Design a protein with these regions (language model features):
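Phosphate-group recognition and catalysis centered on beta-loop-alpha active-site segments
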Residues: 1-265
Length: 265
């Protein structure tokens, strides 16, 4: 089985490839997910959207334009059309012919490779419909041990938990709540994903003490260097939190960088 959500208490660390190894491969494709695992990741973060015919595809944007040779909203096209699109050539011509995967495709891959998936729901207008279909797919493929469900919308996460208590939920935060533990407990949240520029060791300590897993989202190393140029060297703090088992996961686009950090902690 993949690493548990609360990896730190087992002396482990989840290395999560954000949209797969998206620094070097076309994001949210099986190619990028496998590349992440090959580079040392044990988890991949993926994003879900609904097609016009209520099928779940793995894509980040509401529109097709940035990552495929298609155009328009994902919600305005049927699955058959989206599966015909090229999801690799815009990133690099070497990856021409890469396709947009479905949720089912990705779950089957995760089970075959024993890789954990951080599944982010990206469908604010049809969130309830997405949740229902997502849970049905997870039940059909018996994939509960391989996933946690994440979102910026913590009310949606509470609904996921109410409908399927076996699912673990991970709240994404871009702010710092006054009482982060109370806020997460109110939604029955199992884990929290925190941005580096809002990350404080004291919050991680409080969350771990409360039994809530902590995922730290890291920028690309060249962006992290901008903190250093501004007089803030954050690497010792990150390494210290990993070493002291205050962080269960590191997530980012550059799996090589995440691995380097984890090995130097």
């Amino acid at each position: 089985l993949p690493l548990p959500l609360h990896a730190a208490r087992h002396g482990s660390l989840r290395i999560a490839a954000h949209r797969g190894f998206s620094r070097r491969f076309p994001e949210n494709t099986i190619l990028a997910f496998q590349a992440g695992v090959n580079a040392g990741a044990n988890e991949c973060e993926i994003d879900l959207m609904l097609t016009r015919d209520d099928q779940i595809v793995v894509i980040h944007d509401r529109t097709l334009d940035r990552t495929t040779n298609g155009s328009g909203f994902v919600a305005d096209h049927d699955l058959q059309h989206i599966l015909s699109l090229d999801a690799g050539a815009k990133f690099d011509a070497r990856f021409a012919g890469t396709r947009v995967p479905t949720l089912a495709d990705t779950l089957l891959w995760a089970k075959q490779t024993d890789t954990r998936l951080a599944i982010e729901m990206k469908e604010p207008e049809r969130a309830d419909r997405l949740i229902d279909i997502m849970i049905a797919t997870l039940r059909e493929l018996d994939a509960f041990d391989h996933v946690a469900i994440s979102s910026f919308d913590h009310i949606d996460l509470r609904r996921v938990k109410e409908l399927e208590p076996r699912l673990q939920t991970e709240a994404i935060l871009h702010h710092r709540p006054v009482n982060i533990v109370a806020s997460m407990r109110a939604g029955g949240i199992d884990g929290v994903s925190l941005e580096l520029n809002r990350f404080h060791r004291t919050d991680a300590e409080a969350l771990q003490q409360a039994g809530i897993a902590v995922r730290l989202s890291l920028p690309l190393p060249e962006k992290l260097a901008m903190f250093w140029q501004g007089g803030r060297d954050l690497l010792p703090m990150i390494r210290g939190c990993v070493r002291d088992r205050l962080v269960d996961a590191l997530i980012g686009d550059d799996v090589d960088f995440l691995r380097m950090l984890s090995m130097s902690a």
